[in-house]
UniProtKB/Swiss-Prot annotation:
It comes from Geobacillus thermodenitrificans (strain NG80-2). Its EC number is 1.1.5.4. Pfam families: Mqo (PF06039). This is Probable malate:quinone oxidoreductase. It is an enzyme of class 1 (oxidoreductase). One of its GO terms (molecular function) is L-malate dehydrogenase (quinone) activity. The keyword Flavoprotein applies. GO terms for biological process: tricarboxylic acid cycle. HAMAP family: MQO. The lineage of its organism: Bacteria, Bacillati, Bacillota, Bacilli, Bacillales. Keywords: FAD, Flavoprotein, Oxidoreductase, Tricarboxylic acid cycle. InterPro entries: FAD/NAD-bd_sf, MQO. Pathway: Carbohydrate metabolism; tricarboxylic acid cycle; oxaloacetate from (S)-malate (quinone route): step 1/1.
Length: 501
């Protein structure tokens, strides 16, 4: 290893939406800090943040049925939906602040207003959706949501989905205008361009081989230049591991006790993309269905209008796949090398507990294109095989850990921050809702890792995010102000008009 050692205040590993967000927040809060970024690929936002590797849904729990559950007494628990919705507003406020301050220009390049819809078939599912609607519509966060079980109304909302549909059982949908389509790849690239202008050192094609604690409490990284093969040592006071599926291995290398006992289970995704512009033009919404019985939450099927490179697209999925890789550009040994003595029993327990998931993944992997088309035709009855192509999306690594509620080897489906007790290093693990809540999650990192600075930073945080520390649901006036301001700045007026009435 070379003797050259470079010292900096902050190192961010991975040039995805999480590091982009954290770097941008820190440059607002502590502009004098030196920040260095290492990314093993050739540019920012190539892995999970890339627009082709995620669904591009601004997750605000408007249409995702897995965020609202029916309780044993028949009532609908919307607490998770409220939490995710408020977290998405944190992202919207920060992005609006960045547009207002000139950091982000032309917001339509990364966010567009788009109706979010839930669509179900069958008597029980329709009853569930109606109860969900009745519970949510009275909450100020979900004002403007509509429900219909009238096929004629549904034909107005989703003509492509209703064309030639044989309706022989109850059918229903909810619709809310205030949804969004977010191009997280474009947003990530814009934020890294800004960080470069702010003198952040960004090293592409650089791989972090090792992380270790120095005797004086700093973190030393062994970093390899993938082009020249040169190895350097970089030392920092604070390290953030935002390497997507690569985060677990790096967390394990850090040796912090908080990272022990955690495992990861990789799931890949496939989408179908429509190649006929005439069909694409007939649909304008993100329409989420209900996961089949026994299927995992990330398998909820949805038919999405997307805007990629300013072009309107139509995607359907996801279909799950399995690869032992933790990253799309990872190694086939990733899963195997993540198993350590401290997480072996947890991983084995997860294997036993999740046989249904394993069977589901095997079935999904074995599907032919025509079998995938049959699933698509549940949404688009007129879909023609030659008009749809299969694309491979990104890899997600679901967290496996022991929990009080789930016991040993519980598979987690959320996003999780793991940090050292002294706040000197933090890692982001997990998947959904992921990028949509990036600002909330990175503020959580800052709060946990720099508690002594939060009093000093709080006024600036409130300037950027007026609802910081406040429940928007309980403060309707602030909610109204936030909706109006973010709609104005981000060009979302069309979608939010109904909520502002």
């Amino acid at each position: 290893m070379g003797n050259k050692q470079t010292k900096t205040d902050v190192i961010l590993i991975g040039a995805g939406i999480m590091s982009a967000t954290l770097g941008t927040l820190l440059k607002e809060l502590a502009p004098e800090w030196d920040i260095t970024v290492f990314e093993r690929l050739e540019e920012a936002g190539v892995e999970s943040s890339n627009e082709w590797n995620n669904a591009g849904t601004g997750h605000a729990a408007l249409c995702e049925l897995n965020y609202t559950v029916e309780k044993p007494d028949g009532s609908i628990d919307i607490s998770k939906a409220i939490k995710i919705n408020e977290q998405f507003y944190v992202s919207l406020q920060f992005w609006a602040y960045l547009v207002n301050s000139g950091v982000l220009r032309d917001p339509k390049e990364f966010i567009r207003p788009l109706p979010h819809m839930s669509f179900v078939q069958g008597e029980d599912n329709v009853a569930f959706l109606k109860k969900r609607y009745e519970t949510m519509v009275n909450n100020p966060l979900f004002k403007g949501m509509e429900f219909s079980d009238d096929p004629k109304k549904l034909a107005e909302w989703i003509p492509l989905m209703m064309e030639n549909r044989v309706v022989n059982e109850p059918i229903a949908a909810t619709r809310i205008e205030s949804g969004t389509d977010v191009n997280f790849g474009a947003l990530t690239r814009k934020l890294f361009e800004h960080l470069k202008r702010k003198n952040v050192e960004i090293h592409y094609r650089h791989h972090v081989d090792d992380i270790k604690r120095t005797s004086d409490g700093l973190w030393e990284l062994k970093v390899r230049d993938l082009d020249s093969g040169a190895v350097e040592r970089h030392v920092a006071k604070f390290v953030f591991i935002g390497a997507g599926g690569g985060s677990l291995h790096l967390l394990q290398k850090s040796g912090i006790p908080e990272g022990r006992g955690i495992g990861g289970f990789p799931v890949s995704g496939l989408f179908m993309v429509c190649n006929n512009p005439d069909v694409v033009e007939q649909h304008h919404a993100k329409v989420y269905g209900k996961a089949k019985v026994g299927a995992p939450p990330m398998s909820v099927p949805h038919l999405d209008t997307r805007f990629i490179n300013n072009q309107k697209m139509l995607l359907f999925g996801p279909f799950a796949g399995f690869s032992p890789k933790f990253l799309k550009n990872g190694s086939m040994l990733d899963l195997f090398t993540s198993v350590k003595p401290h997480n072996l029993l947890t991983m084995l327990a997860a294997g036993v507990k999740n046989m249904a998931l394993t069977n589901y993944l095997i079935q999904q992997v074995m599907l032919s294109k025509e079998q995938r088309m049959e699933e698509l035709r549940e949404f688009v009855p007129t879909a023609k095989s030659e008009e749809w192509d299969v694309i491979v999306a990104g890899q997600r690594v679901q967290v496996i850990k022991d929990t009080e509620a789930g016991g040993k080897g519980t598979l987690q489906f959320g996003t999780e921050v793991v940090h050292a007790a002294d706040g000197s290093i933090a890692a982001l693990l997990g998947a959904s809702p992921g990028a949509s809540t990036a600002v909330h999650v990175m503020l959580e990192v800052i709060t946990k890792c720099f508690p002594e600075r939060m009093k000093e930073w709080e006024p600036k945080v409130r300037e950027m995010i007026p609802s910081y520390g406040v429940s928007l649901m309980k403060n309707e006036r602030l909610l109204h102000d936030v909706q109006a301001a973010t709609a104005e700045m981000l060009g979302l007026r069309e979608g939010l008009a109904l909520q502002l009435v």
